[in-house]
Swiss-Prot record:
Source superkingdom: Eukaryota
Role according to the record: Involved in respiratory growth and required for cell survival in the absence of prohibitins or GEM1.
Record family assignment: Belongs to the GEP7 family.
Protein name per its UniProtKB record: Genetic interactor of prohibitin 7, mitochondrial
Transmembrane segments: 250-266
GO cellular component: mitochondrial membrane
Organism: Saccharomyces cerevisiae (strain RM11-1a) (Baker's yeast)
Location relative to the cell: Mitochondrion membrane
Keywords (A to Z) from UniProt: Membrane, Mitochondrion, Transit peptide, Transmembrane, Transmembrane helix
Location of the transit peptide in the chain: 1-24
Membrane-related topology note: Single-pass membrane protein
Length: 287
C-alpha cells in the first residue's frame, strides 16, 4: 500500500510538472492577444469602404424582415401604405453610396485631369500655372452636368487634405466654381442688373425700389473715343451703419420711437415737477 501510494504521488507530481508550463504558455498567449493589437500600416481605399457600405446597406434591407418587428418599422410601413409616392430612405441612401462610389472611381481613373486638359489649355495645367482668364470664361459653361458633379466631388474630397499639395489650376477652378468672376465680395451690385432690390423691412413684397440707382443718378459725359480707355473701378468698403443707408420705412420707425421716447420723458418730468411743488408748499407751511 505504501509503495502504491508513493507511485501515485510521483505520477501526479510528474503530470503537474508537465501541465504547469503549458498553462503558463496559454496564459501568456491570452495576455498577448488581450493587450497587444498590431497596427495596420496600410489604410483600406475609399472605394473598398464604399463597397462595404453598399453591401451592408443591402444586407440590412434584406435581413430586416428576419429581425423582430419594432414600433418604428411598423409606423414606417403604415406611412408607406398611406403615402405610396413618398421616397424610400433606404433606397436614397443606397443610391447615394453608389453615386459616391462611381465618382470615386472616376476621380481615381484621372477623369478630372482629362476634363481640365480638354477644356482649359493643357500646356498651362501640366506646368502648374494659372488658367487663362478668357479660356476659363469661355469653356467653363461648356462643362456638362456629369463634369460639374465630378468637380464638386473632387473639391469636397481634396479640401480635406493638405491645400499646399493642390495645383494652381485646380485652386483657380475651385475659386471660379464657388464665387464666379466677381469673387467673394459683399455689397457688390452691377449697374446693368435687371432685378431690383427689395426692402428688407418686414420683407414687404409690394414695395420695390432700386436703391443702387437712387444713389447713382449722376450722368457721366464720356466721349465715344474714350470709351475703350474707361476702366471699371468698384468702390468696396466695409459694412457700416449710416443714416443714408437705411431704407425709408426703417427711418420712419426709428423716428417714431425717438418721438415717443421724448414724449414719455417730458411727461414723466412734468409729473415729477407737479409732485415736488406740493411737497415744497408743505415744508414752507410747517416752518
Amino acid at each position: 500500500m505504501v509503495l502504491s501510494n508513493v507511485k501515485i504521488f510521483r505520477l501526479k507530481s510528474h503530470r503537474a510538472f508537465r501541465i504547469g508550463p503549458m498553462i503558463k504558455a496559454v496564459a501568456g498567449n491570452l495576455l498577448v492577444k488581450r493587450f497587444y493589437q498590431p497596427k495596420l500600416e496600410r489604410i483600406p481605399p475609399a472605394s473598398l469602404l464604399l463597397k462595404q457600405k453598399i453591401r451592408l446597406a443591402q444586407n440590412g434591407s434584406t435581413t430586416s424582415t428576419e429581425n423582430p418587428i419594432s414600433f418604428s418599422q411598423t409606423m414606417s410601413e403604415i406611412f408607406s401604405v398611406l403615402q405610396p409616392s413618398a421616397p424610400d430612405l433606404d433606397e436614397d441612401e443606397t443610391s447615394g453610396l453608389k453615386r459616391d462610389h462611381l465618382l470615386t472611381e472616376r476621380l481615381n481613373n484621372g477623369e478630372l485631369g482629362v476634363i481640365m486638359n480638354k477644356f482649359f489649355n493643357p500646356s498651362s495645367t501640366h506646368n502648374n500655372q494659372l488658367i487663362d482668364t478668357n479660356i476659363l470664361l469661355q469653356n467653363f459653361p461648356k462643362l456638362s452636368g456629369n463634369d460639374l458633379d465630378l468637380l464638386d466631388f473632387a473639391i469636397n474630397e481634396k479640401m480635406r487634405g493638405n491645400w499646399n499639395d493642390l495645383k494652381q489650376d485646380f485652386i483657380q477652378l475651385w475659386y471660379y466654381k464657388s464665387f464666379g468672376f466677381l469673387g467673394p465680395r459683399t455689397q457688390f451690385v452691377l449697374t446693368n442688373s435687371s432685378p431690383s432690390l427689395r426692402s428688407q423691412f418686414l420683407k414687404l413684397p409690394f414695395i420695390e425700389y432700386n436703391w443702387f440707382l437712387l444713389q447713382n443718378n449722376k450722368n457721366a459725359n464720356i466721349l465715344p473715343a474714350d470709351v475703350q480707355n474707361v476702366v471699371k473701378v468698384f468702390h468696396l468698403d466695409d459694412k457700416r451703419f449710416s443714416w443714408k443707408s437705411i431704407d425709408p420705412f426703417s427711418k420712419a420707425i426709428i423716428s417714431f420711437v425717438v418721438f415717443v421716447s421724448i414724449y414719455v420723458w417730458l411727461d414723466e418730468s412734468a409729473k415729477q415737477k407737479t409732485k415736488e411743488l406740493p411737497a415744497q408748499k408743505s415744508t414752507v407751511i410747517s416752518e
